[in-house]
Amino acid sequence: MRKTFFLVAFVVLLVFISCDTPFFSHEGQKVTVMIVGLDYEPRQKDVFDKPIDLKWSSYSVGKLLGTINDSKEFGAALSSSYKEKNVDNQMIFMLSEGDSPDYSNPLYPTATNIISQISSLELDEDDLFVFYYAGHGFLEDDELYFITADKSLGSFCTELKASYLMDAIESVGCRSAVIIDACYSGAFDPKNSSTPNTLTNSLKSIFKENINTEYGYQMSVLAASKWNEKSLENYNVLFNDGNSEIHGHFTGRLLSALNWRHSLSKTTTVENSDGTMIVANGYSSGIVGSLSLDDIYSKLFDERDYPDLYQYPVLYYTNESINLIPAN
């Protein structure tokens, strides 16, 4: 009888460990969302003079028309969903918008300020940290970099190495969801450079190389494009009054997955961490049930337009994907 019992227990254990592990949820826990968006609006005559010691000096940096719309509305969509589901959350917007920002503001998105804001977070291991970036990205020696602002010159002449960003996010010490809308953003995974195009449909692409096992927390990374693709701004929203609004191809569809409704007449206001108010054009129509990054990736991949011409979204994660929105 004892042999039979242990045999049954062993079989049950095998069945259990062979099943997919449920997605982690953050119900009852705190969510901190950091939104970084840059429009690269020229601010002075020599704004694009490029110091020769910076890697991005050989790249063309043009103004982006959709990044601020993307940043404000994605943040508002998350904030609205968390509020609806009674999830404790904090919103941190780091935006470089227009031709006269406050360069002295600690939320101005220089590379130093971004890392400093992340490093100052005090979260528990069961909390969730969501990081979103909308801006220019470039590759140099197989490394991904983001072009950030410089407060001393009021220009764009600093760069943030993706691996440094990942180190900072890992050190927060909790589960994290990283969403990047930038050219070549799939380069977050060094293996991706050898991944055939036909494999990008896999929902189980494993993101391991950039994970420091010292921490061991769950991390999901959703990238707008593969390592060798640009991230386009061709998602145009037309309003009834004839006005229009530009979004990134990736974030436009990301907002759709979050049931965001674009509107000029009905806006959403979100309080930033410094007490200022961020106004987004539109509102959330609500999300029934939970929404994981796996769910979002599947929707983005299935709804991509002209897949041979536009970019492919890419998803990496350690062990399990993460619920961006909880069930209730």
Task: Please place each PLM-identified region on the residue numbering.
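Positively charged n-region of N-terminal signal peptides that target proteins for export
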Residues: 1-4
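Bacterial N-terminal signal peptides
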Residues: 8-16
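Boundary/activation segment at the start of structured domains
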Residues: 19-145, 235-238, 317-328
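Soluble non-cytosolic domains of exported or imported proteins
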Residues: 61-72, 105-112, 155-163, 241-249, ...
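Solvent-exposed, polar/charged alpha-helical surfaces in well-ordered, non-transmembrane soluble domains
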Residues: 69-76, 80, 112-119, 163, ...
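Sec-exported extracytoplasmic/periplasmic mature domains
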Residues: 76-84, 119-123, 170-174, 184, ...
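Caspase-like (clan CD) cysteine peptidase catalytic core
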Residues: 111-134, 138-191, 296
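Active-site-proximal C-terminal subdomain of hydrolase catalytic domains
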Residues: 176-308
